[in-house]
Design a protein with these regions (language model features):
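Short, solvent-exposed aromatic-acidic interface loops
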Residues: 64-71, 188-192
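A short, acidic/glycine-rich surface segment
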Residues: 30-35, 109-113
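Signature of the catalytic double-stranded beta-helix
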Residues: 1-29, 35-41, 50-54, 194-197
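Residues lining hydrophobic/aromatic ligand-binding pockets adjacent to catalytic sites
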Residues: 34, 63-64
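Short, basic/aromatic beta-hairpin or loop at an interaction surface
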Residues: 59, 66-81, 121
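Short, conserved beta-strand element in jelly-roll/cupin
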Residues: 26, 39-56, 66-69, 93, ...
């Protein structure tokens, strides 16, 4: 049932058809995960916590992610102030029933767990990736009709993007009225990234 609800959530909110076979991980004394990026598993990664965080007997176990400012570190750099760890790394505690979804290209890891050798008291999580992004249709519109229009957008996209060095995925939800016009367009999820100097152009393109 959990798998079914997770898949349904990914379809509704991310535009991804499925999830990869999920993994169950248990972190005890000395376990950690160094900073890394997951490529090319899927456009979104997830971590669902089964950890009784409020009653934990260990230290550590937070999910760590580099902040965007670090990934484009020298843009707007100021040498007049010091920088603390919290400004470089985002920490997310694995609280019970928390679902964390993030762009797996961002370097991420897990802070080392110390304080328990008992697997019943460790950092317990289910994790994996949302995969297979593709169109979904609700209503009488046929898949064949929609796909023919989507294929026609391919050439137009090249003109819209131009030389913008964009990478990532964007998912949209929209309705089609009786005249065949798209309306009520909404961005569901967006992992597109560009160098900081080009972000205004990226925002204009996506929005």
């Amino acid at each position: 049932r959990f798998h079914e609800r997770l898949v349904a959530w990914g379809r509704e909110n991310l535009g991804c058809h499925d999830v990869s076979p999920p993994w169950l991980s248990n972190y005890v004394e000395g376990c950690r995960q160094e900073l890394h990026g997951d490529l090319p598993h899927g456009p979104w990664a997830f971590v669902f916590s089964l950890t009784n965080w409020k009653r934990r007997t260990f230290r550590g176990g937070e999910t760590l992610m580099l902040r965007d400012e670090v990934l484009d570190y020298w843009h707007g750099f100021e040498s007049t102030r010091s920088i603390e760890q919290g400004e470089l790394i985002r920490e997310i505690p694995p609280e019970l029933n928390r679902l964390v979804v993030f762009d797996p290209r961002i370097p991420h890891g897990v802070r080392q767990v110390t304080g328990t050798h008992d697997p019943r008291e460790g950092r317990l999580v289910i994790h994996g990736w949302f995969v297979q992004p593709r169109p979904f249709i609700q209503g009488p519109l046929s898949t064949k009709t929609l796909m023919s229009r989507i294929e026609g957008l391919t050439d137009q996209l090249g003109g819209w993007i131009g030389e913008l060095p964009i990478a990532g995925m964007v998912s949209l939800r929209f309705a089609v009225d009786r005249q065949g016009q798209a309306c009520h367009v909404k961005v569901l999820s967006d992992t597109t990234r560009v160098p900081a100097r080009d972000d205004k152009e990226r925002t204009k393109l996506i929005r």
